[in-house]
């Protein structure tokens, strides 16, 4: 075996591409490494197309092996299971920029598998996987119009940083991944700490310029190690069939696309489609339904795109920069902690915020170890939202991706745990959908968080932009419909505050998207975002002053770290009895910070009082109220504060001589005692002598009524 290796410098890292030694039965296989992070990527492409295949079956799988980090998986089976949310998101990250680079009409099945086999904790494997997938496709010989490059851009001390390490990323105000060809950007995924539109665009341009090194290296690698290009040509257009479909459907489709209501429009389009299929197949039974539908869809695209480029009204009658009608309601669910319904045209999100304690935080078992997430965001897209029936179950890739985008949009304005000691979960239920439900989720989440009294730094709104481009003629669309997304050339989503951008996601289906077009889209998105924020601020101008009556109240107190074991008790018995008896939740940090959560304020005060008693120190000369726990011939043991116990010697029970302890004291009896001495071993000597004559008076002078409380002398 003589592997072929290509090595090049990429920013501060060294990238190595190797092929020819492993997985030689795959169509192509590449071991891509960036320093010590290695991802093994394979491509298998079928030479034959399944009969009746009318779509491109591309599958991208990304999987992390725990051995890559020198770990053994947890759980009973001790092996990796179904893909995690993080793995699903990275699979989407690989898929999005490569899918548009396969030619129209190419329906051969392709599977890409990226396996993380070694990981340096400072270098994320996602970028390495993208580079490896691009290289493997370039070697495979399939009709792939790549290669693509990929770059991560950080923003530290007002400077762009190429492929920052994990430690550098913690100081960065930006996490942006950009992928594209040598000519154009194809995909952007980012999260930002409220940067300007100009800074975001500059980051995209910077990343695209830097990744040219990767593209050139992969071209050289493919020239040396690549397989012969497949002899594939796109099937010739059936002009007779195209004209036939056009003659039946064009005018009727034109009228249908003037129906502004989505369901009514779809019903009319379905009728036209069924009529076309019936008429065409009646004349020639050999023509497949799939081919007719492809031509029908292309005709729909021509009609919609042509109208937009000619400056005619859009499908729903709007101009290119008009945002659909907005409707906002907050506090819609009485027993939840915060809720809002955000409606934009025919897209609607019900967002609900829930506050929890630190024990509600999500523990994520990542490749390099466990991570705790205190802000959870879940996006649900039920079939009824588009008027369909379907399966209900675990979230699909799309739901996971949309939820993460919405979370990125809101994360920058969330308070820190020290500012607001709650774990926060937001759920966005999409109840209607006709374009940009993820951005509706951002708006709904912002409203629900404010309704819940979460002190977010500013309101956040999101907007989806579209593009229709033919040669040098282009139109940027604000607040796109589902059809405009499907038939357009770009899906460009921007979330942010009045001050700047918090998240940017871009997927482009064509080449030739210039920085000028992106700048126009960003400016138009800013204008739309300001309009939406204005309406949101009218509904709820600031976070509620107080949290919901149904949300847990979290109170904090400090104890001596040495006393933590006393509060917890043997095997957790003490803290468990506190929580069970009061209905509270108690979390104790190593520094002695105690967080007590409960809906009932009185329960919290009771717990705080009991913890103060448990952790209190017994002092010499102080008088306490205690309870007799044991009797002995030589005296009585009395429970004091802080789980401490002292001895009242028989000679210290009364002024007169005591012959028998049980004549004066009984187990469970409350008594007033004074601390005489605490010896080196911590043993406490008590006396009742001076206090025995006037126990009643001392009881009236109690500072606190609880067992073990000190009293005034």
Curated annotation (Swiss-Prot):
Give positions of region: Disordered: 694-713
What does the similarity note say? Answer: Belongs to the polyribonucleotide nucleotidyltransferase family.
Name the reaction it catalyses: RNA(n+1) + phosphate = RNA(n) + a ribonucleoside 5'-diphosphate
**Cofactor(s), by name:** Mg(2+)
Biased composition (Polar residues) is annotated at: 701-713
Q: What does this protein do?
A: Involved in mRNA degradation. Catalyzes the phosphorolysis of single-stranded polyribonucleotides processively in the 3'- to 5'-direction.
Which cell locations does it reside in?
Cytoplasm
Q: Where does this protein chiefly localize? A: cytoplasm
Q: In its keyword annotation, does this UniProt entry include rRNA processing? A: no
Every copy of the KH domain together lies at 552-611
Keywords from UniProt, A to Z, are: Cytoplasm, Magnesium, Metal-binding, Nucleotidyltransferase, RNA-binding, Transferase
Q: Name one GO molecular function term.
A: magnesium ion binding
The entry's Mg(2+)-binding residues are 485, 491
Q: What is its EC number?
A: 2.7.7.8
Q: Which residues form the S1 motif domain?
A: 621-689
Q: How does it assemble?
A: Component of the RNA degradosome, which is a multiprotein complex involved in RNA processing and mRNA degradation.
GO BP, one example? mRNA catabolic process
Per its record, how is this protein called by name?
A: Polyribonucleotide nucleotidyltransferase
Q: Name one GO cellular component term.
A: cytosol
